């Protein structure tokens, strides 16, 4: 009886699972997205020529922004019949790679402040798209959204292959050690996901990453020096980089926000169809996209880079069927503490 109650809570959107079950599932979401979350900040800081201290602030803002954006999506603070801010769906928000090429160009020609100014304009574009999503949605039937979801999955393969090889720019990119660790990690995840039961199946990704990490330790591939040199606690610095508006940058980022707003339909649809066996409602789509826009406007003042729904975490929800908001909120809190 106790097992049935726990399962229904874990797989229920509004349940409150036990900490010992929620924490590993939350951590699984974090380890699946944290590299993708901080990498854009690292790339932008390098192109912009930021000092080490400013680079840390930008990375810190990326984590805090992702955490707060996720919490806004999970727990909408405005939700009426005709208007909502936040979807209330089990999604994870993070700094998006889709903006990286444009951000690199802007950072090289201008500065980080110009990216943040363009982000405000882009957020306003997303809010506009979200407000009219009820009318726009008819142009995206299940056939179209299904194709988008399929495309999202395919688009992750180049990123996955690069990470498996060691990460673009790595000195040992493509080495046999990298491929061995990656393939062993993949094997652990695949075996547990198909043959494991209970928490072993649900936390297959986390267990696979831990296993891969241990294997990497034996190969001497883990460097602890950055952890030793890092400060234990640091408060975020709002408006540290300032805000600047440049028309060309605003247009480029604004267009990307419009495109990502449409892609969000696919991510929200993949989340509900994969984890909840239904399509998202108009209210959920509107709240999700409006929340996406407003969070980017607000958190630009914290120095956070543009966010978007994370497809890899959508995949976790669809695979494990764990849609509990408290689990994903736990992931957001881990990101917040890390930031």
Feature map (PLM): residue ranges:
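Intrinsically disordered, low-complexity non-transmembrane regions of multi-pass membrane transporters
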Residues: 1-25, 224-239, 273, 277-280, ...
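N-terminal signal-anchor module of multipass membrane proteins
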Residues: 1-91, 98-106
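Membrane-embedded helical hairpins/re-entrant loop segments and their flanking transmembrane helices
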Residues: 19, 45-86, 255-325
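Generic transmembrane alpha-helix signature in multi-pass membrane proteins
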Residues: 41-47, 99-108, 134, 158, ...
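Flexible hinge motifs at transmembrane-helix junctions and intramembrane kinks/re-entrant loops
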Residues: 52-59, 187-235, 240-262, 266
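Structural signature of hydrophobic alpha-helical transmembrane segments
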Residues: 52-68, 109-123, 169-184, 250-257, ...
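Membrane-helix interface "capping/anchor" motifs
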Residues: 74-89, 134-139, 193-203, 320-325
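Membrane-embedded alpha-helical modules
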Residues: 106-223, 329-339
